[in-house]
Amino acid sequence: VHWSAEEKQLITGLWGKVNVADCGAEALARLLIVYPWTQRFFASFGNLSSPTAILGNPMVRAHGKKVLTSFGDAVKNLDNIKNTFSQLSELHCDKLHVDPENFRLLGDILIIVLAAHFSKDFTPECQAAWQKLVRVVAHALARKYH
């Protein structure tokens, strides 16, 4: 994947403003609320019975932070995303059996969260760069699937 200097700047510039804990928690909570069938991968998280329960669930919050922290590795390694996510792809494929479509859904949710938090900075050009990034990350995570 080729990244222009402008794309890299738009991605890293916005990423520097992201509160990983808050945005990660919100993104994962939104995924579980908007696409309730994704909850089956999080049965060990306890109460996911309502939007209020999901938004207040500390395990959702912690895992959301973990997911977005890992997404930060993509931002730091834009030219090597495939290898950056190689082990996570294996884990999600072989051990967790996560439907790879969920990576795309989470990427789209992340775009919504970023737009909501950074409306002034989230220009159409910025959105295009981030949309490309979440697509590349989703593809890298789905790589180990047969």
From Swiss-Prot:
GO terms for molecular function: haptoglobin binding; heme binding; metal ion binding; organic acid binding; oxygen binding; oxygen carrier activity; peroxidase activity. PROSITE patterns: GLOBIN (PS01033). Keywords: Heme, Iron, Metal-binding, Oxygen transport, Transport. Transmembrane segments: none annotated. Residues 2-146 form the Globin domain. Red blood cells. One of its GO terms (biological process) is hydrogen peroxide catabolic process. Heme b binds at residues 63, 92. CDD domains: Hb-beta-like. GO terms for cellular component: blood microparticle; haptoglobin-hemoglobin complex; hemoglobin complex. Belongs to the globin family. Involved in oxygen transport from the lung to the various peripheral tissues. Heterotetramer of two alpha chains and two beta chains. This is Hemoglobin subunit beta. The gene is HBB.
